[in-house]
């Protein structure tokens, strides 16, 4: 499907210098204008999003490729990064934010690292090194990434790590088909406790992602399923198994809690339609998006509780297929496929990212294409396959919403061959921080990560 001509995705900058080996994933910091990238060269590189240059290189913690990383939220005074590697371990790294959590602070970090970044030197401490050849020694500890702890438990490659909204729980998943949940005891000694190991997946678990406000975990797997996990009576267990994809599910991501579809200027009573959509949407909560080897991007919506109770069957087994003696039927959730987004990829889709600021979606994959989608409210339009229905109540009628109120997803921008001939492994949204940004706005950039080692930053012009 052709993108609308009113939107354009343009290259803003490459992150320099790049890794000379495959890069897997880029994780923007939740508060600072920096991004961490994972590489096959066993390192994590931290770049500035203000000038797109390398700030530091984290080395020495892993023996094989670093596949994934995630920043811990709600940490004051320091940055905490979790990394997952093909060596089957998870590393926790810390760095004091002595420069402060402001853009001015990032400039301070630049001044502290005035060396030639391309030299990519480390301090040789055997754990973590920050590129720094100009320190006087007194502040050296403040400038280093500290290798805090190694979490060991998986039997094979770690594919994804994700912190819970509170930052107290860390979820990890692996090729060994398991999902582990670790609790950060926050005792000052970097101690973590294993609170759950889930092994219901029948294949390599590719991705884990936490609900934006609840302690609910979503996972995606080589077994073509998406599974939802919650804690019940001090035990973690599966509450839903979503089947719909016809191939490996590579990635899942959650909608932001405050997301609202855009209302076209020609939509009559746009404010009323938006209010009605929000009211109906609140019954189900944030939706889930997934992408797959089957070249589709799908959106899933949880049924409201009243509707779930109405549809529940008096069976000794819940919707997950687990006996009720282990997992009570009342804890099961029912998820519906809300829509399949417009077909826009020719090969496997590796990552889909849901912007928490704008509600737009971006997808990338083996075809080297970047696709950006936008959801729009429509009233009384002709039916299309990408249109979505509002949540329904137990009697099957639309909940507090006119029958004609719908949303539809449209492709608004595409870039072919974004990294030349190379596959794109990951895409993420980040708040724009360079000098070209528009002040007073929530302007965003897209960050794409590819097989050739490059990481590119893109702007979307509407």
Swiss-Prot record:
Location of the region described as Disordered in the Swiss-Prot/TrEMBL record: 116-140, 303-323
Cross-referenced InterPro entries: CIAO1/Cia1 (IPR028608), G-protein_beta_WD-40_rep (IPR020472), WD40/YVTN_repeat-like_dom_sf (IPR015943), WD40_repeat_dom_sf (IPR036322), WD40_rpt (IPR001680)
Start and stop residues of the WD repeats: 15-57, 61-103, 153-192, 200-239, 244-310, 344-383, 418-459
Residue ranges of the TM segments: none
PROSITE patterns (UniProt xref): WD_REPEATS_2, WD_REPEATS_REGION
Protein name: Probable cytosolic iron-sulfur protein assembly protein 1
A biological process from GO: iron-sulfur cluster assembly
HAMAP family for the chain: ciao1 (MF_03037)
Keywords, alphabetical: Repeat, WD repeat
Assigned GO CC terms: cytosolic [4Fe-4S] assembly targeting complex
Similarity section: Belongs to the WD repeat CIA1 family.
Disulfide bond annotation, renumbered to this chain: none
Protein species of origin: Neosartorya fischeri (strain ATCC 1020 / DSM 3700 / CBS 544.65 / FGSC A1164 / JCM 1740 / NRRL 181 / WB 181) (Aspergillus fischerianus)
Ranges in coiled-coil conformation: none
Role noted for this protein: Essential component of the cytosolic iron-sulfur (Fe/S) protein assembly machinery. Required for the maturation of extramitochondrial Fe/S proteins.
SUPFAM superfamilies: WD40 repeat-like (SSF50978)
